[in-house]
A protein has these predicted regions:
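Short glycine/proline- and aromatic-enriched beta-strand/turn motifs that initiate or cap beta-hairpins
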Residues: 18-81, 85-86, 96
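Residues that define the transmembrane beta-barrel architecture of outer-membrane proteins
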Residues: 36, 76-80, 126-132, 155, ...
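Residues on the lipid-exposed face of transmembrane beta-strands in outer-membrane beta-barrel proteins
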Residues: 42, 82-90, 96, 134-140, ...
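Outer-envelope beta-barrel architecture signal
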Residues: 34-40, 90-92, 143-147, 169, ...
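Outer membrane beta-barrel transmembrane domains
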Residues: 183-260
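Extracellular loop and loop/strand-boundary signature of outer-membrane beta-barrel proteins
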Residues: 27, 66-70, 117-124, 157-162, ...
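Transmembrane beta-strands of outer-membrane beta-barrel pores
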Residues: 44-50, 98-104, 140-144, 151-157, ...
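Outer-membrane beta-barrel translocator domains and adjoining extracellular loop/strand segments
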Residues: 52-59, 105-113, 158-165, 196-203, ...
Length: 260
């Protein structure tokens, strides 16, 4: 399906090039070269991070609230998506994304003080499904510099052993140096993710025990460094690596631009 969507967008390029209304207000850019207004791209994104537990409940007789401070949670996410974008204004790009996400979250319950004959161990939550969302980028540039801010909202339609829901809001500030087809930049990721999982786990001697857990990112920001290269005015790629504050991120993008 992804290949069909990309092919359809590329076949539509000649028609878009013939008469494109975007970007609007292009005269405010003066004699600066603007990118072609339409883009279709492929993103590959990975995220490793820790979580805090907002709430955790087990349906066990005689068990009340659980001390979540003794629980460690690790999360790994892998996402690939197709991104469609348009420069509505010389400084404003809007986009939509659709793709596939998979992840695994390990909730270490071994230190939870519950009156059970054996420790709880680790609750492993695996999920996969479709991810969709959208966002916008504000960008300003001089002859050899640029700055931008991108905001993205995504929601996932997931399948797995449990009833799962994942929502995420991301902000990406960047500032960089322009040198011909190359752009070198520093930035970061502010990622606010909420995961909710409901289901049942098998405990020795107790059988199937229902649970309900809500998770939040425990460190919302990490810095990043990246590089962009423009092969032609149609083809461009970006690589961005981030780390710090208990989080690691990787982004690889290839975009085909058309119209103008």
């Amino acid at each position: 399906m992804k290949k069909c969507l990309i092919l359809a967008a590329l076949l539509a390029a000649p028609a878009a090039q013939a008469d494109s209304p975007f970007p609007l207000m292009r005269d405010i850019a003066g004699d600066r070269e603007l990118p072609r207004p339409y883009g279709v791209g492929i993103d590959f994104f990975t995220l490793d991070q820790g979580y805090d537990i907002d709430s955790l409940a087990f349906s066990l007789p005689g068990v009340g609230g659980v001390d979540t401070d003794v629980i460690d949670v690790d999360n790994n996410v892998r996402e690939s998506d197709i991104k469609f974008d348009v420069w509505v204004l010389p400084f404003l790009n809007v986009f939509g994304i659709f793709g596939h996400v998979s992840g695994d979250t390990a909730v270490d319950l071994s230190a939870v003080p519950l009156p059970l004959p054996v420790p709880l161990g680790t609750l492993d939550i695996e999920y996969s499904g479709q991810v969709f969302g959208g966002g916008a980028t504000l960008a300003f540039a001089g002859e050899h510099w640029f700055t931008s801010l991108t905001g993205t909202y995504t929601k996932s339609d997931l399948s797995g052993d449990f009833d799962s829901d994942v929502k995420s809001v991301t902000w990406q500030p960047r500032v960089g140096y322009l040198n011909g087809p190359w752009v070198f930049f520093a930035g970061g990721y502010y990622i606010d993710t909420e995961e909710k999982h409901q289901g049942a786990i098998a405990l020795p001697g107790l059988g199937s025990v229902p649970f309900d857990v809500t998770l939040q990112s425990n460190s919302k920001f990490n810095p990043s460094l990246g590089v962009y290269y423009r092969f032609t005015d149609h083809a461009e790629t970006t690589l961005e690596l981030g780390g710090g504050n208990g989080r690691q991120t990787t982004l690889l993008n290839f975009t085909w631009r058309f119209g103008g």
